[in-house]
């Protein structure tokens, strides 16, 4: 029986490349001359720390980072940015977390979405991924389109497609 897995992963090497590209752009931009503005990727925590001298500049840096992530194939919705920025001395910073895996609440929404579609497929939650099995490949492709079209707050990838 054909099956595939729904996952939500961020390639850390691509994220590192995007952070490096964003750093290069900030170094060459006129409005950031003489300003302390940095990006730091923490592989262990899967976070990106954005630091600058004002909250407005932190927002600008986040926009640059999102653009560079998108260019490297990582959607902006995979970046979880807190609403409040931290003010410490003369600097402002924010730690944006890269979303890895699918949370259980989102998993339940996906399974409910698939079951409500009345397609002849079964969805099973397996850890941080969802296995979808069905008799026809067309039904599985319909499920892929359904999950992509649903506004669930994070990007999804499909892997382990088996016939």
From Swiss-Prot:
Q: Does the keyword Nucleotide-binding apply?
A: yes
Q: Which SUPFAM superfamilies match?
A: YajQ-like
| A GO molecular function held by the record | nucleotide binding
Residues passing through the membrane, by range: none
Annotated Gene Ontology cellular components are:
cytosol
Q: Which UniProt keywords apply?
A: Nucleotide-binding
The answer to whether the entry has keyword Nucleotide-binding is yes
Free-text function comment from the UniProt entry? Nucleotide-binding protein.
Q: Which PANTHER family match?
A: UPF0234 PROTEIN YAJQ (PTHR30476:SF0)
Q: Which family does it belong to?
A: Belongs to the YajQ family.
Query: Could you tell me which NCBIfam families the record lists for this protein?
Result: PRK05412.1
Q: Tell me what this protein is called.
A: Nucleotide-binding protein CKO_02735
Q: Which organism is it from?
A: Citrobacter koseri (strain ATCC BAA-895 / CDC 4225-83 / SGSC4696)
